[in-house]
């Protein structure tokens, strides 16, 4: 059309040149985040936050600048995993994320509360708005890989993240129980419906390895992950054993010291993508 400014958002005309309106939120002007990886699970109790923490530490050990955006607003655990308890501070440009001594940056609702045990009793739209602000109002600085720790399920927060953040990939955390396969399928299908690429699966609690004889015991039953991976044509990025040491380090706020060798292959694959 003659006289078209190219700004479709301020134009009321209907024409063939109209571009679809983007729902992506603008990052903070002090942020330079190269890749955003969402970590999701179809249900709770599969160790998603543990896997998120391990991936961030693994990427950091590979020499990348990493960050975690804790989008699990009503059940945040990332700050405690890294021993971060002090409230964050702000600047003229926005909020400054907490940072571990090793350099992993973290933003979580718990870092804004006067007391980390205070409950967050918000409805879905308010929670979604807070997560979006963690992207727009936080000065992340230079970050090579940002991992977004999403709450379980396929609700409002996942929708907000997939629509508002430039998600480059999704890692789906699962466990060997048969029920999980059905629920994980929902997460894969949602990502694909929203044109968000899925990197693959990480199976947690895959087995327990006896420290004496080395025998692997499938405590939660035989895994069906290979069937699921074949069904969706997705790779299995890692199978993580039950590791009491990892659980202890998470509770003690020392995840930066954890042995992350089990997820290093997954981190290396993502780095090559």
Where are the regions that the model predicts?
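C-terminal lobe/tail of nucleotide-utilizing enzymes
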Residues: 1-23, 188-273
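Phosphate-binding P-loop
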Residues: 28-34
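Residue-level signature of catalytic and energy-coupling elements of molecular machines
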Residues: 33, 44, 70, 78, ...
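Walker A/P-loop phosphate-binding motif and the immediately C-terminal alpha-helix
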Residues: 35-73, 188, 194
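Phosphate-binding loop that captures ATP/GTP phosphates
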Residues: 65-66, 71-116, 128
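Glycine-rich phosphate-binding loops of nucleotide-dependent enzymes
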Residues: 107, 150, 163, 199, ...
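Phosphate-binding/switch loop-helix module in NTP-utilizing enzymes
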Residues: 113-161
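Conserved Switch II/interswitch segment of TRAFAC-class P-loop GTPases
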Residues: 141-148, 154, 166-187
């Amino acid at each position: 059309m003659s006289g078209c400014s190219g700004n479709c958002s301020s134009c009321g005309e209907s024409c063939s040149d109209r571009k679809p309106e983007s729902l992506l939120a603008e990052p903070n002007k002090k942020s330079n985040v190269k890749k955003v990886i969402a970590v999701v699970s179809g249900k709770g109790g599969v160790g998603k936050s543990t896997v998120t923490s391990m991936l961030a530490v693994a990427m950091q050990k590979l020499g990348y600048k990493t960050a975690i955006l804790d989008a699990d607003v009503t059940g945040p655990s990332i700050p405690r995993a890294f021993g971060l308890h002090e409230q964050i501070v702000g600047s003229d440009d926005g909020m400054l994320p907490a940072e571990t001594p090793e350099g992993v940056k973290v933003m979580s609702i718990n870092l804004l509360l006067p007391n980390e045990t205070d409950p967050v009793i918000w409805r879905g739209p308010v929670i979604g708005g807070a997560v979006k602000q963690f992207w727009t109002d936080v000065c992340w600085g230079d970050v090579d890989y940002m991992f977004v720790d999403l709450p379980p399920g396929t609700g409002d927060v996942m929708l907000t993240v997939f629509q508002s953040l430039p998600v480059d990939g999704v890692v789906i955390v699962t466990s060997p129980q048969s029920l999980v396969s059905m629920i994980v399928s929902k997460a894969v299908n949602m990502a694909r419906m929203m044109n968000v690429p899925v990197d693959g699966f990480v199976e947690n609690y895959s087995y327990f390895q006896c420290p004496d004889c080395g025998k692997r015991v499938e405590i939660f039953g035989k895994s069906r992950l290979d069937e699921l991976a074949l069904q969706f044509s997705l790779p299995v990025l890692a199978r993580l054993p039950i590791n009491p040491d990892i659980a202890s380090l998470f509770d003690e706020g020392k995840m930066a010291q954890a042995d992350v060798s089990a997820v290093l292959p997954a981190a290396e694959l993502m780095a090559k993508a």
